[in-house]
Structure formats: C-alpha cells, structure tokens
C-alpha cells in the first residue's frame, strides 16, 4: 500500500444528523477509504472517495464463498482533539483474520495512516457528547468475478465511518438478560472462532433470534465439543466475579481475542484485582451462584465497552445476579476504561492515538 492517500472530493456534502438521536450504525459520513488488491500489484490505489454504492460482479467470490472479514473501533472527540483507541490492535487482528481465510494481509502502518487522513477529513462528523463516538468499520472482501472454490485473486478494502450515540443513553449501565445456548454452537477449535469473519455472525443469528423471542437480549455460547464450557456472549467476551476474583475464559482458538477484553484484564490487574484466565464451565457458575460466590457478570466489547449481565438462564433455570444491578467491580472497570477513552483520565498506557490535522 502507498502511504500517499489520494482524495476524490464530492460535489456536495451531506446534512449532518441530530447528535441527540444518532443510535448505532444509522448514519454514514461523506467519505470512505478504499484500497484495491490484485495478485500482480498487491494492495494499491489507496484513496479517500465519496461514500456511495459501488458495482461488484454477481460472481464475486466473496458473495459465494465467504471470504469477508471486518473490524470495529472508535474515534472520540475531547476538547476539540480527535483520538483513536488502540487502533494498532485492530489492524493486527484484521491481519490474523485475513490469514485464516487465505486473504492477503495489509500493511498495518500504511492503513492506520490512511485511516487518520480519512478521519481528519471527517473531523466535523465526530460527535462530542457524553458517550458518543465515531464508529469505524474496516472490512475486506473478495471481488474476483469467477466461480470455483479457491482463494480470490482480487479484493477490496473499505473503511466506512458512522457517528454513534451513547450505548446506554447516558452514564448509567443497564443490565442485560442472557440465554445460555445449549443447542447451537458458535465455533469449534481449529475453525474460525478466533477470527472476525462475516460468517461467524451470520451463523449466530438463528440462536440470537430464538433468545430474543424468549425475552433475552443475547446468547451465551458454550464450547463446540462438550457444550459445557463458557466461551463468549453475543458479540462480546465474558467476565465473572467469583470470590472477588475477575475470571474470564482463556483464549483457546474458538474465542475472539477482544481488544476490550485485553484492555479490561490489564486495567483490572492494575486496579489490584486478581484475574484468572481459564476454562469456566456453566456448572461451575451456577454452583458458585448457589454458594453466594458469583457476585457479578459482565460482557466486554467495542460497542458497549462493558455490559453488565443481570439475568442468566440455562436450561430451565434462571438466576438473577446482584439484583440486576451493575456490581462495584463492573462499574469501576467501566468508569476507568471510558475515562481513559474520553481523555478524562490519564492514559498511562499510550492507548489513545491522536488524529493530526493534515
């Protein structure tokens, strides 16, 4: 990829939405970043272009054989400064996903530079309200128009931007209801569970819909072999507080290595909490609850940062955790994490990356 980013200016700019009613993924900025790949040139022709529909061959391999990966990260505005949060980790992870699907890896530094230039162009789209952000969606898909199960020789990478509202609509964390899925599985070891590939999310929709019909917000996935060990919840990693310890399932190849998860573990340790990464069975959790040892449960991910779990149902039993209220450790981790993101707290880790004015 070239570090020089071309800029194709659009004739007129969009009217920006009311920041009081942004929601998530509903609005998109004026421009997007585009990069092409072919077997002869590699990644090339990085440019900032108007956000608009584009043509693709009906035979594009990504539509038929699933070569498609994506990422999700955010930019924040504080006192006029626009910053990214750990973007290097997202581009490392997208390369891991690309490698797993036999897709060409990207130049992480060049892509980050292109993203910074895109966000600088769209600086006025970054909302500054409490909990608001500019959601960033990089994605790569196969474009070669030929049928046949093999790796494509052509790909396109796009980065689109979407101003997003506060996940909870304010500062107060809201607990979720979780259904433990014991029929379908999300991933198996040796598969693509550790990668952020489009098919993982498509495969989760049926179980998610079934859980919603029963009155639950998300699904807690169990392992794909014995269906007894906890893996992750919905589109988030999962944490438990047992006997004052912060416990999370160890990465095993079928769990997405969340960047929020990684950050939460480091923050928890630095705040003095004991953290355990290990196998956690669903039976252990319900036994711990019966003994009064399971006091908090929460998920972690880019969208919500931290999402407290207030209700957990497995088979015919439902338990209520901490009276459906966020626990003290959950709240402390959320406040610390979002404080660093927003610039209200010191960033001693170097996680915030400023977007310069070009």
Swiss-Prot record:
Pfam families of this UniProt entry?
Aminotran_4 (PF01063)
Its transmembrane ranges are none
By its UniProt entry, which CDD domains does this protein fall under?
A: BCAT_beta_family
- Its EC top class is transferase
| The enzyme's E.C. designation | 2.6.1.42
Leader peptide range in chain numbering: none
**Domain of life of the organism in this record?**
Bacteria
| Catalysis performed (reactions) | L-leucine + 2-oxoglutarate = 4-methyl-2-oxopentanoate + L-glutamate; L-isoleucine + 2-oxoglutarate = (S)-3-methyl-2-oxopentanoate + L-glutamate; L-valine + 2-oxoglutarate = 3-methyl-2-oxobutanoate + L-glutamate
- GO molecular-function terms, A-Z: L-isoleucine-2-oxoglutarate transaminase activity; L-leucine-2-oxoglutarate transaminase activity; L-valine-2-oxoglutarate transaminase activity
Where in this protein does the record say N6-(pyridoxal phosphate)lysine is found? 196
Q: Which GO terms describe its biological process?
A: isoleucine biosynthetic process; L-leucine biosynthetic process; L-valine biosynthetic process
State the function annotated in the UniProt record.
Acts on leucine, isoleucine and valine.
Family under the similarity heading = Belongs to the class-IV pyridoxal-phosphate-dependent aminotransferase family.
* Protein name, UniProt field: Probable branched-chain-amino-acid aminotransferase
Report the source organism. Staphylococcus epidermidis (strain ATCC 12228 / FDA PCI 1200)
